Design a protein with these regions (language model features):
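A short macromolecule-binding patch
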Residues: 111-116, 177-183, 662-679
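Electropositive polyanion-binding surfaces
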Residues: 47, 198, 204-205, 231, ...
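Divalent-cation-assisted or electrostatically stabilized phosphate/pyrophosphate-binding catalytic cores
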Residues: 692-696
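Charge-lined substrate channels and their catalytic hotspots, especially those that engage the 3′ end
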Residues: 4-301, 308-353, 632, 685-686, ...
Length: 721
């Protein structure tokens, strides 16, 4: 009998080993969730979880004791337990990472909580979820388990179809989705292998590895230029076609100006007026007029397309514009906020056509002092459409059409600019990367577009008009409350980011003031931007400096604009391509012309928030389209060698920006195989463990183009020693 007992004990030990602690913890937690309203006795738990051996029962009691210590369950009576519902369930947002390190961000802030893939309940990035929170156990990170998906953030995905006989998959590069989407044959909408498609996830059964979806739209063949541009728009949830019903409504708007409209407006048709725009522009939002009033006194008019005269509040065109909130400028096309008939014809301030405008009129001295300003509805007629290049040539050669007017405006703009910088405005003088594209949309060359005097001339008068409009509404006596109005606001830089910037530039031998008055700091930033001009680190330091700044946004709560050093600022000058400018036009008319009462703060703040978020999405889509063209451009240049500079350092590798064309690619850390490299976040570098070699942000480096992945919009480089 003793022999038999020993065998039995051995068997029990084996059974005890068979179930790991981790598995039992999971089984217990799942069981408590299923029976969350019941009190469970120890005996009942043993029975239901088939814990028949002594070691397993002991392990179970240890875990129950830990869960009780962690306040996850309560021992309501001796050996009787109940799930604790207080404080262990939280609502928030699920964040999915491509490396499986998913997390949960609690509503109302708080530290992220790790959610293992097995506990994610197929949640997708951005989903609003409820989790059960396992408090910290000895030596273990706090963990959460998704117990309910409250709201899907995104259920449509863009990818490439792979079609088999009776089913298909959508293969997506979206890193927030762990698996491809399964599509039944009857839900394919005629899609074929190699088609780019938009697919909606309709269900994701508990036990299924893949979500199940249906095709919403076929965009075209992968690799085709229009298909790829539409795919980028769809990825960001932006529309790629214009609704026919809205186009139809625009077609009914008459282009003729009725006689009674002339009578209501100031007439500027006989005053020298012109537009200055990019050479490929069709939507001319703004025009400038100039005339001499008397010695040392000039009248300058900033005339803006009177879009809201044609687009009435609440109309079908207005609702579409509100939803879009901005035009989107991809690398080879514009996705307009308004129907084409309005933005390129009726509202566009085209030469030799009479147009309705909303204008800011200034009386200015030769020294740039503003003696008077008014905001009025006008009728104008542009005499000439200049490209920036043409206007620039007149400024440089002092010869050409309307040279006196252009040179006068240029001189006044330079004074306004000088005053702005003296007041503490920050001078980020960035160039843009542009592609020359053939008729098929293929990039054939890269060029840089920098801001010259002609651009700065237009910019200064737009800033002046925007500021003046904001002051007219916002600047009121202390005893009065200003009427509700959308402002363009920009907060002070984050002090921690400024400190990081200061430490970063020190290695290049530059200094930065991070404390003192607002103006002290901004002047110090300008000083830095001047110092780096023409240096090889210019682009890099400028990029890092911009990252230290806050993002400008729209709000009815005015805090001023730090970057421009204005106490009051708004957007008034681009109503063809920005919805906030349309709001500003409507409110100006209501307040200034009609003496109307203030509008709802809540409603307009919501419109401001929506516009700010759409502006960000549009900027991200624009960047993605540039990235796509960069990768496409470099596909033809595989194996070629380029000089560049390290533009980013992460734990997975080095980002390198090429000097010649500003294309950015990555050297994966796995390819740096001469040592084991560790990421030093504080010093923006990778450091070799044995040889101590470092690769730092800003280092000059030579690379070879190794791989180009258009699907991922990703370039891989190889280091050349």
């Amino acid at each position: 009998q003793i022999m038999a007992k020993t065998k039995k004990e051995k068997k029990e030990k084996k059974a005890g080993k068979r179930m790991k602690k981790k598995e039992l913890v999971k089984a217990l937690l799942d069981f408590f969730h299923i029976k969350q309203d019941e009190v469970l006795s120890l005996k009942y738990i043993f029975e239901q979880l088939h814990l028949t051996t002594h070691p397993l029962k002991m392990l179970c009691m240890d875990i129950l004791s830990e869960l009780s210590d962690d306040d996850y369950i309560t021992e309501v009576d001796k050996h009787k337990y109940k799930l604790n519902n207080h404080g262990v369930e939280m609502t928030g947002t699920f964040q999915r990472k491509s490396n499986g390190k998913n997390s949960f961000i609690p509503e109302g802030g708080g530290d992220p909580i790790f959610v293992a893939e097995r506990n994610s309940a197929h949640a997708m990035a951005g989903d609003k979820v409820r989790i059960a929170f396992y408090a910290k156990r000895r030596g273990r990170e706090a963990e959460g388990e998704v117990i309910e998906i409250l709201e899907r953030a995104n259920d449509t995905f863009v990818g490439t179809l792979e079609v088999a006989k009776s089913y298909a998959f959508l293969v997506t590069e979206n890193r927030t989705l762990a698996n491809d989407i399964f599509i039944p044959k009857e839900k394919l909408k005629g899609g074929k292998t190699g088609d780019k498609a938009i697919v909606k996830v309709v269900e994701w059964p508990d036990k299924a590895k893949n979500p199940i979806g249906q095709v919403i739209d076929i965009l075209g063949k992968a690799g085709d230029n229009t298909t790829e541009m539409h795919a980028i728009l769809a990825e960001f949830g932006l529309p790629y076609v214009y609704p026919a019903s809205v186009e139809k409504a625009a077609d009914k708007i008459p282009a003729e100006i009725p006689a009674e409209e002339y009578a209501k407006r100031e007439d500027f048709r006989n005053i020298t007026t012109f537009t200055i725009d990019p050479k490929d522009a069709k939507d001319f939002d703004d025009a400038l007029s100039v005339r001499k009033l008397k010695d040392n006194l000039w009248e300058v008019g900033v005339h803006i397309a009177d879009v809201t005269h044609y687009v009435t509040e609440g109309s079908i065109i207005d609702k579409e514009a509100e939803k879009r909130a901005t035009s989107v400028y991809l690398v080879d096309r514009t996705i307009p906020m308004l129907p084409e008939r309005l933005c390129n014809f009726i509202c566009s301030l085209r030469p030799n056509e009479e147009k309705l405008a909303y204008s800011a009129i200034f009386e200015m001295t030769d020294k740039g002092e503003i003696k008077n300003s008014r905001i009025v509805h006008t009728v104008i007629k542009s005499d000439r459409r200049f490209t920036y290049e043409e206007a620039q040539q007149i400024i440089e050669t002092k010869e050409g059409d309307f040279k006196e007017e252009i040179l006068k405006l240029d001189a006044l703009a330079k004074i306004l600019r000088e005053k702005r910088f003296a007041a503490g405005a920050i001078n980020f003088d960035r160039y843009e990367v542009k592609f020359e594209i053939d008729e098929k949309g293929k990039p054939i060359s890269v060029y840089f577009k920098e801001s010259k005097d002609a651009n700065k001339l237009v910019e200064e008068f737009m800033l002046l008009a925007n500021r003046t409009v904001a002051e007219k509404i916002g600047r009121v006596p202390k005893s009065k409350k200003p009427k509700v109005f959308p402002y363009r606001i920009h907060d002070l830089p984050d002090p921690e980011k400024l400190d990081n910037l200061s430490q970063f530039i020190a290695r290049f031998g530059y200094k930065l003031r991070t404390s003192g008055t607002k103006t002290d700091v901004s002047k110090s930033i300008n000083h830095l931007l001047d110092d780096i001009q023409g240096k090889k680190e210019e682009n890099l330091i400028e990029t890092v400096s911009i990252r230290a700044m806050q993002k400008a946004r729209y709000s009815v709560h005015n805090i001023g604009h730090y970057g421009l050093s204005f106490d009051y600022y708004t957007h008034f000058t681009s109503p063809i391509r920005r919805y906030p400018d349309m709001l500003v036009h409507r409110l100006l008319t209501k307040y200034l012309d009609l003496g109307g009462r203030s509008v709802s703060e809540q409603k307009y703040e919501a419109l401001c928030e929506h516009s700010s978020s759409m502006e960000q999405i549009a900027a991200n889509a624009e960047r993605a389209s540039i990235k796509y063209k960069q990768v496409e451009y470099m596909t033809e240049r595989l194996g070629q060698t380029y000089d560049g500079v390290i533009s980013g350092v992460t734990e997975w590798g080095l980002y390198v920006e090429l000097n010649e064309n500003k294309c950015e690619g990555m050297i994966p850390i796995r390819d740096l195989d001469d040592d084991y490299y560790e990421f030093d976040e504080k010093n923006y570098c990778l450091r070799g463990r044995r040889k101590k070699r470092t690769y730092s942000l800003g280092d000059a480096i030579t690379i070879k183009v190794a791989r180009a992945n258009l699907e991922k919009k990703q370039l891989d480089f190889a280091l050349i020693e």
